[in-house]
C-alpha cells in the first residue's frame, strides 16, 4: 500500500502536544488502521478483481459487473478515510510549530533584554510583557507547549472535523457497500446478454475485516467525542482560572517606572537622550520640547538636564574670560515643562543665563594695538 512512514512521522510528533484521549486516538489510528491496512487487509483484497467471476463468456461483462458491485475498492476507500481524518491533526501540528517558532523569537528577544539589563537599563516592563505573551501562547518551558488559548481552539476545531469525517465515511460506506459482502452478485448491465450471476472470492474473510474496520471507526468516533468534551471543559476551566491568573490579576496595567534617574533608562523608555545636543541660543519663539510631555518622570529629567546644560555653557564662557558685547537676554528662551497647574515654567533664578562676552578671535592689527589703551600682560611697567 505504499510507504506510510512520512505520515507516521508527522503524526508521531503530535503525541507530545495531545491530551490523553488524543494519544489513545493516535494509537488506534496507527495500530488498528494503518498497520492493519498495510498488512492483512491489503492481502485479503489483493485478488478482488482477478478472482471476480461471472457465469458468462461475453467480453466486458465481468468488468462492468465488478464496477457496479464495487464502485471503489474497500482498501482505497479506507486509505482516503485515514487521510481525511489525519488532516485536521496535521493542521493542529502546524499550529504547534507556529507556537514553537514564536517561542524561539520571544526567547531571543528576552536574551537581548537581559543583556541590556546587565548594562544598567531597567527593562522589567518589557520582560514582563514577554512573560505574558508566553503565557498567552501556552509556552511554559523551553520546547514545552501547554494547550490554551488559540492552540486549544485549534485543537477543538480539529476534533470536530475528525468527528465529521468519521461519520461521513461511515455513511458513505453504508450507502455504497453496506457492512457485509455476499458470495453471489446479480448483474444485468450492458454488454451482458442477460442477467448473470457473479461470484466474489473469500466473502466471509472480507466481511470480517469490514466489521473490524467499522468497529475501529466507531471507537475513534467515541474517542473524539470524549476528547471534545474534555477540551471544552478545559477551555471553560482555563477561562475561569484566567480571571485570577497572576499575570492578569496582580500586575495591572503595565507602565514604565517613574524613576528616570538613570540616563540609559530615560533614553530606553522614551525620555530625552542625556547626550542630546541643546542649542546654546534659541531664537525667539522657539520652544525646546524634550521627552514625553505627558510623562512627569521624563519632565523632571528633562528639566534637570536642560538646567545643567545651561549652567555648563555659562561656566565655559565665563572661564574664557572674554569681554565685549553681551547676549541679549531676549534670546534665552525658557524651556517648557508641562505641569498640572500651569502651562510652562521658566528656569530658576539661579540658573538664568548670565550676560556673556563675545570677542573677535582674530589678531589685532598694529593700528588697533597702538590705539588701544588697555594694558596687556607683556607690557613693561615703568
From Swiss-Prot:
Output compositional bias ranges, type Polar residues: 317-332
Query: In what way is this protein post-translationally modified?
Result: Phosphorylation at Ser-325, Ser-328 and Ser-330 by CK1 modulates gap junction assembly. Phosphorylated at Ser-368 by PRKCG; phosphorylation induces disassembly of gap junction plaques and inhibition of gap junction activity. Phosphorylation at Ser-368 by PRKCD triggers its internalization into small vesicles leading to proteasome-mediated degradation.
Which Pfam families does this UniProt record tie to the protein?
Connexin (PF00029), Connexin43 (PF03508)
Phosphoserine modification sites are: 5, 255, 257, 262, 306, 314, 325, 328, 330, 344, 365, 368-369, 373
Q: Per its UniProt record, what SMART domains does this chain match?
A: CNX, Connexin_CCC
Phosphotyrosine modifications at: 247
Skewed-composition ranges (Low complexity): 362-374
The UniProt entry lists the main location of this chain as membrane
Q: State the compartments where it is located.
A: Cell membrane; Cell junction, Gap junction; Endoplasmic reticulum
- Asked if Phosphoprotein is a keyword of the record, the answer is yes
Please give the positions of the paired cysteines in each disulfide bond.
54-192, 187-198
Q: Offer a single GO CC term for the protein.
A: intercalated disc
Q: Which regions face the Cytoplasmic side of the membrane?
A: 2-23, 98-155, 229-382
Q: Region Interaction with UBQLN4: which residues?
A: 264-382
The subunit structure is:
A connexon is composed of a hexamer of connexins. Interacts with SGSM3. Interacts with RIC1/CIP150. Interacts with CNST and CSNK1D. Interacts (via C-terminus) with TJP1. Interacts (via C-terminus) with SRC (via SH3 domain). Interacts (not ubiquitinated) with UBQLN4 (via UBA domain). Interacts with NOV. Interacts with TMEM65. Interacts with ANK3/ANKG and PKP2.
Protein's name in the database:
Gap junction alpha-1 protein
